[in-house]
Amino acid sequence: MRFNNKMLALAALLFAAQASADTLESIDNCAVGCPTGGSSNVSIVRHAYTLNNNSTTKFANWVAYHITKDTPASGKTRNWKTDPALNPADTLAPADYTGANAALKVDRGHQAPLASLAGVSDWESLNYLSNITPQKSDLNQGAWARLEDQERKLIDRADISSVYTVTGPLYERDMGKLPGTQKAHTIPSAYWKVIFINNSPAVNHYAAFLFDQNTPKGADFCQFRVTVDEIEKRTGLIIWAGLPDDVQASLKSKPGVLPELMGCKN
């Protein structure tokens, strides 16, 4: 049987699509189950992160990512783009942030951090606006940035091979609107982050943090430690959904010891 060029091209495309699907199926940015519950709409799996988009707020309900010794990188550009995997009506575009910094003193804040993950193959997706929220400059450049730095430094330890994080916004009061868009959207009033190391939080090496949008720039991130229970109650999500119920209950009601490895004092 002879194959013409069109048939060969089609076969190549089908093979590439299947290979891509197989690769995505092997990605696990959560390790012990991604969050469940809440107002979930669309989930997207990438090497850089897994996120759950909310078409009402226009921002992710949560973003999960996995830092290894190979994922950090520097010198990457910040080229903001609309997420091509989403309906444009369900997310924001770069122009929607016009005037936001001057009017609201907000930055385009990464949920999955660029510096920690720029070494992955699809690093450019870190600059998709599905992974971005309007985060107050004082928070983004202050306590949040210092927490991200300490999170990334964990991977430098010989006894740590992986850092798993899930992060997201809270909407508990009105924070105004972006002046550059007519799209309906909701600016977060707070942000949370849950971190554990290696393969499971079950050995007590985990941490949970919650920051108000108006956190002062000089604030110590260690002062914003909370339990996973508190984050679940305020978000409506179930974190670490793949763990047995009794293990979840035991861990989530108390703070973990991971902050001690991140420079926090008891």
From Swiss-Prot:
Mg(2+) binds at N140. SUPFAM superfamilies: His-Me finger endonucleases. CDD domains: NUC. Its main location: secreted. Keywords: Disulfide bond, Endonuclease, Hydrolase, Magnesium, Metal-binding, Nuclease, Secreted, Signal. Pfam families: Endonuclease_NS. It is found in: Secreted. It catalyses: Endonucleolytic cleavage to 5'-phosphomononucleotide and 5'-phosphooligonucleotide end-products. Its EC number is 3.1.30.2. This is Nuclease. It comes from Serratia marcescens.
